[in-house]
Amino acid sequence: MEHSQPNSMPQDLSEALKEATKEVHVQAENAEFMKNFQKGEVTREGFKLVMASLYHIYDALEEEIEHNKENPVYTPLYFPEELHRRAALEQDMAFWYGPRWQEAIPYTQATKRYVRRLQQVGRFEPELLVAHAYTRYMGDLSGGQVLKKIAQKALDLPSSGEGLAFFTFPNVANATKFKQLYRSRMNTLEMTPEVKQRVLEEAKTAFLLNIQLFEEVQELLTQDTKDQRPSQASDIRKRAGSRVQDSTPVTTPRGKPQLSVLSQVPLIRWVLTLSFLVATVAMGLYAM
């Protein structure tokens, strides 16, 4: 009986990932912020912040993927034409921030934490990169499509898809079939049981990075509901700003300036928008 314990883990990596992340799936599914997003409570100003955060995250992820594209621990999952989002997000940045978007986009503390982890994995633990690629791209191909429709309606965006290039995968003809292909490729990766367990733990870390963001947003939301008087608006922005500016040195993707835009947007819009960011991950991954 004691020898049956190792066999309790699903043999296929894709199934093992699904099983290992069930608990964090539930946490994300039951998050209060989901109700806000499902009601379409997203503003244009806030959505810009969401897209900027996604740009930083995918810029870091895909830079590390490029560094490891010939590494056997990742090569079978290298689908730049079908999946990579950086070019699409650059289009979205130009739409939302204008031609000088690289000088204008914000870089929040929660995003920095995510980027730091991606850089660490890509450079020192590339065998774990599959966990981040799987959770992000498969989520984008699933629940991300639902979020696109909600955002398009809530923000009254053009039906042509301007400002939403991130959600469009022109080189994926059938999302369901492609996800099946991706999972089958994942299952061909050779790894020891020890490495496999680390991959599963890293997938949980990817979820937890977003749950931490949710907790931060909830705290700011609680503070904002307690401080509604105009005379206190400056103090609220200062509290929020202290959370966005991270004193810890960090490598900025492509050397972009780390500019805060919180002073330009009402806090409540910022809070609701960050909720949208976490909702993208939570809903997208749960749909897998």
Swiss-Prot record:
Heme b binds at K18, H25, Y134, R183. Residues 1-20, 224-256 are annotated as: Disordered. Its EC number is 1.14.14.18. Keywords: Apoptosis, Endoplasmic reticulum, Heme, Iron, Membrane, Metal-binding, Oxidoreductase, Phosphoprotein, Transmembrane, Transmembrane helix. Residues 1-265 are cytoplasmic. One of its GO terms (molecular function) is heme binding. A soluble form arises by proteolytic removal of the membrane anchor. Its main location: endoplasmic reticulum. GO terms for cellular component: endoplasmic reticulum; endoplasmic reticulum membrane; nucleus; perinuclear region of cytoplasm. It is found in: Endoplasmic reticulum membrane. PROSITE patterns: HEME_OXYGENASE. It is an enzyme of class 1 (oxidoreductase). SUPFAM superfamilies: Heme oxygenase-like. GO terms for biological process: apoptotic process; cellular response to arsenic-containing substance; cellular response to cadmium ion; erythrocyte homeostasis; heme catabolic process; heme metabolic process; heme oxidation; intracellular iron ion homeostasis. Pfam families: Heme_oxygenase. It is a single-pass type IV membrane protein. It catalyses: heme b + 3 reduced [NADPH--hemoprotein reductase] + 3 O2 = biliverdin IXalpha + CO + Fe(2+) + 3 oxidized [NADPH--hemoprotein reductase] + 3 H2O + H(+). It comes from the Eukaryota. InterPro entries: Haem_Oase (IPR002051), Haem_Oase-like (IPR016053), Haem_Oase-like_multi-hlx (IPR016084), Haem_oxygenase_CS (IPR018207). Belongs to the heme oxygenase family. This is Heme oxygenase 1. The lineage of its organism: Eukaryota, Metazoa, Chordata, Craniata, Vertebrata.
